[in-house]
Regions:
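Long, charged low-complexity segments
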Residues: 2-30, 57-154
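Short, hydrophobic, well-ordered secondary-structure elements
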Residues: 38-58
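Short coil/turn linkers that connect adjacent helices within long alpha-helical scaffolds
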Residues: 34-35
């Protein structure tokens, strides 16, 4: 494996799509807090999560993800980190429906005339996306460090 190339490709992908995910998350927060536009906030949050998972997949595997479904993406990537696994897993106290909700946001927020969500629920989902984005950023950073270290040994 050419680790210098793997590092360069992964770093480019990381810088591009992590930035887009973070920008969408900021736009979601603005839509939520400034204009109270739940539809845009939901759509942008869900799309940010998709970008974060695409980034993680590419950094770890060097390939594009073949899905844009947050439920499938999480299921395939969750074993990379217990923190990531626990960010969306149910507890003995509550069932966490964030991933299925994000999936529905991707389809229903832009196109569904009857789309509606309580602001309190959306805020919880947005916070989980923010938390997962941070976890993914840290995981990618560790992987990029490994690629760089291995490329220096070649």
């Amino acid at each position: 494996i050419d680790f210098a190339k793997a590092y360069a490709d992964a770093k480019f992908h990381f810088d591009t799509f992590r930035t887009q995910g973070n920008e969408l998350l900021e736009q979601a927060q603005d839509a939520f807090s400034e204009s109270r536009n739940m539809r845009l906030a939901a759509q942008f949050s869900a799309q940010a999560m998709v970008y974060f998972y695409h980034t993680l997949y590419y950094v770890y595997h060097g390939l594009e993800f073949d899905s844009h479904d947050p439920v499938i993406m999480h299921d395939r990537m969750r074993t990379l980190s217990t923190k990531l696994m626990l960010a969306f897993d149910d507890t003995h106290i509550e069932n966490i429906f964030t991933l299925p909700r994000l999936k529905s946001f991707l389809m229903k927020a832009p196109y569904g005339i009857r789309f509606d969500i309580a602001p309190q629920k959306l805020e919880i989902h947005m916070e989980r996306v923010r938390k997962a984005g941070g976890i993914i950023e840290n995981l990618c950073g560790l992987r990029l460090e490994l690629y760089k270290e291995l490329s220096e040994r070649q």
